């Protein structure tokens, strides 16, 4: 208001993004940049009725049994503690799987990110398969020991549309 009182024309005034749109009425001014709110991928409350958009779908490349003691992965190899049935998901971080936008860098934010990565899952039909180890560059290993699936079955996983590469974009 002081700027307008001094005789300056500002045009549309906006200095807020998605978080302010959802949580801070005073920061909205004349408009907001609601990029991540449109994707449902911003800090939000449980009752905001937004839906997260963006998922990838690919067929499983291979399914096989691996013996106890077998090593899986390259970046941080995991030694299997028991005979495990694994599936190869032909998607990795180069495709955007497991890639997230940096948020906070506090200890608790990083700890929360680490816990989420330990629990990352993929849907195969109506079943959930947990990722074994870390997401690879071009492939990711899944534990499908107790699941009914085979090579060629469609796997669906959460992916941020801003980082998705190597996929046909389809809006449903």
Q: What is the meaning of each model-derived region?
A:
Residues 2-172:
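Active-site anion/phosphate-binding pocket segments in diverse small-molecule metabolic enzymes
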């Amino acid at each position: 208001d002081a700027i307008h009182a001094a005789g300056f024309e500002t045009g549309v005034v906006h200095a807020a993004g998605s978080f302010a749109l959802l949580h801070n009425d005073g920061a909205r001014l004349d408009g907001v940049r609601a990029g991540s709110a449109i994707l449902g991928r911003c800090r939000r409350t449980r009752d905001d009725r937004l839906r997260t958009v963006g998922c990838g779908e690919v067929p499983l490349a291979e399914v096989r049994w691996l013996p106890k003691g077998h090593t899986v992965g390259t970046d941080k190899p995991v030694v299997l503690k028991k005979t495990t049935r694994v599936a190869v998901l032909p998607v990795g971080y180069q495709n955007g799987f497991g890639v997230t936008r940096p948020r906070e860098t506090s200890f608790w934010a990083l700890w929360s990110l680490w816990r989420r990565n330990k629990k990352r899952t993929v849907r195969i039909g109506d079943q959930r398969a947990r990722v074994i180890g870390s997401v690879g560059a071009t492939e990711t290993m899944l534990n499908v020991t107790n699941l009914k699936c085979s090579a060629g079955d469609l796997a669906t996983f959460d992916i941020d549309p801003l980082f998705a590469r190597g996929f046909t974009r389809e809006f449903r």
